[in-house]
């Protein structure tokens, strides 16, 4: 058996090279020794295969760790990377290796695309009315060069794996157990690419940015998660794509507050208008205005309900309400005439219980308290 070169030497990098350095070296060398650039050159083709083999191992953290520990033996028959057990991970890893594939574990079958998580900020008003938002999603999409096959030769495409014969799994005797696990050659895909696509390096997908228009329904709350099935990263070599999860962040409003489907708006009101009664015009979240009658004698904290002016309730035809909360303002700075009028008012009001029922009742209780009646 021919002696294999060190994978780090094949990629012309040091053993502490990071992922970006590995990728850069791989792309440079793969381009240099690609068979399309070296037609009929058997040595270049062999070198190209070595480069792909080395990168396939070193780009994967688990495979790289196994290679650093055991060398090429990790991926040969009986080695830890090719079916043997590595007890360094504890009992959980051992049982996952033994039973993971038979019970639908992560190693079996083609690898579906990853899910994507993205946050979208919308205004309070947009949450009220609903909105369509264009979003840019960094993702992996099907490679156009090879149409997702991962092969430079579209007609040939991927070949049936010679190890598992297309099953994606292999069986091995481990002591008393017959263990079924993902094929170490094709990693569960059932197929292998002999001539990898230069654009996607055999993955079948490439990194791109996509722009989507997302419909955010009326009534969403801060923290709502929206799932778009199949809009995640493309699966490798024909596998199913992942999903896109949009986390909605609703910006606060300077005038309105929200509690569930209900909206609250605090409206300051002059003391005189609260005493005499009035009609006020208040804003609604959708930009319209409505009038509210405030009866004479209105106190701070009283609410006036506007039915159906709140948020839509998701997956329902119901709507919340809007509440106008009155806050009676006491003037801080008075003119001489205003002070005189208030003094006249106070002298006239006196202890008149009908005019000031709450204060009269309160001070009556205070008097009873000091007299020992309470």
Curated annotation (Swiss-Prot):
It is found in: Cytoplasm. It holds the Pfam family DnaJ. Its main location: cytoplasm. Its cofactor is Zn(2+). GO terms for molecular function: ATP binding; heat shock protein binding; unfolded protein binding; zinc ion binding. Residues 6-71 form the J domain. CXXCXGXG motif repeats lie at residues 143-150, 161-168, 183-190, 197-204. One of its GO terms (biological process) is chaperone cofactor-dependent protein refolding. Disulfide bonds: none annotated. One of its GO terms (cellular component) is cytoplasm. Zn(2+) 1 binds at residues 143, 146, 197, 200. InterPro entries: DnaJ, DnaJ_C, DnaJ_domain, DnaJ_domain_CS, HSP40/DnaJ_pept-bd, HSP_DnaJ_Cys-rich_dom, HSP_DnaJ_Cys-rich_dom_sf, J_dom_sf. Zn(2+) 2 binds at residues 161, 164, 183, 186. PROSITE patterns: DNAJ_1, DNAJ_2, ZF_CR. Keywords: Chaperone, Cytoplasm, DNA replication, Metal-binding, Repeat, Stress response, Zinc, Zinc-finger. A zinc finger (CR-type) spans 130-209. Binds 2 Zn(2+) ions per monomer. Belongs to the DnaJ family. Participates actively in the response to hyperosmotic and heat shock by preventing the aggregation of stress-denatured proteins and by disaggregating proteins, also in an autonomous, DnaK-independent fashion. Unfolded proteins bind initially to DnaJ; upon interaction with the DnaJ-bound protein, DnaK hydrolyzes its bound ATP, resulting in the formation of a stable complex. GrpE releases ADP from DnaK; ATP binding to DnaK triggers the release of the substrate protein, thus completing the reaction cycle. Homodimer. The J domain is necessary and sufficient to stimulate DnaK ATPase activity. Zinc center 1 plays an important role in the autonomous, DnaK-independent chaperone activity of DnaJ. Zinc center 2 is essential for interaction with DnaK and for DnaJ activity. This is Chaperone protein DnaJ. It comes from Gluconacetobacter diazotrophicus (strain ATCC 49037 / DSM 5601 / CCUG 37298 / CIP 103539 / LMG 7603 / PAl5). The gene is dnaJ.
